Amino acid sequence: MTTTHPPFCVLMAGLPGSGKTTLSRALTARGFVRLCPDEEMYRRHGVYGVDFPRGTFPTLERPVLEDVAVDLREQLKAGRDVVVDHGFWTPEDRARWSAVAADAGATPLLVYLAASHNELWERVSKRNEFHADDPNSIYFSENDLQRYRSRFVPPAVDEPHVLYDGDPVTVIAALEASGRARSVEDDSR
């Protein structure tokens, strides 16, 4: 979607099963371009743990993320609203991608998708059965999920974000509010 306001870039902080893909698809229904590194990994390398060994994911993902960042920059510079369907587990990752968005003239918005271990595991264990055919259903165990949680750093109070309540309208309202704030800021210059 090409916009009359500076484009929005929605970045998400959340573990597997937290609802990132569901939210990103809801935003695409509103005209957002969706970029998903996991889908690109699947296109390039196949099924995680089947077509390439489990331990190689970070190495294979690095160039994918670099290419997605280039695509993000191009989409935003073209005036399109974009949602990046990725977990952004650390403040450093979130800051880096937020800077890419801001440098491209976009208004970045971080959305935190919090969920309990039980909620995450219930969703992930259901998705595991589809891992061979669905790039958004990477197979992993409950121990993997616990290990991932130990590496995930939720956004702190000093890291601006919207806490996702399960309703995409909340995110849309936050985008509209940040867009209005940016318009007022631009008008005052």
Language-model segments: residues:
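Walker A (P-loop) ATP-phosphate-binding motif of ABC ATPase nucleotide-binding domains
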Residues: 9
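Hydrophobic anchor at the beta1->P-loop junction of P-loop NTPases
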Residues: 12
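Conserved substrate/cofactor phosphate-moiety recognition/catalytic segment
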Residues: 18-80
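Conserved beta-strand scaffold positions in the cores of enzyme catalytic domains, especially
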Residues: 32-34, 108-110, 159-163
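Glycine-rich phosphate-binding loop used to anchor ATP phosphates in small-molecule kinases
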Residues: 59-108, 112-113
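A glycine- and Lys/Arg-enriched "phosphate-lid" helix/loop adjacent to the NTP-binding pocket
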Residues: 103-153, 188
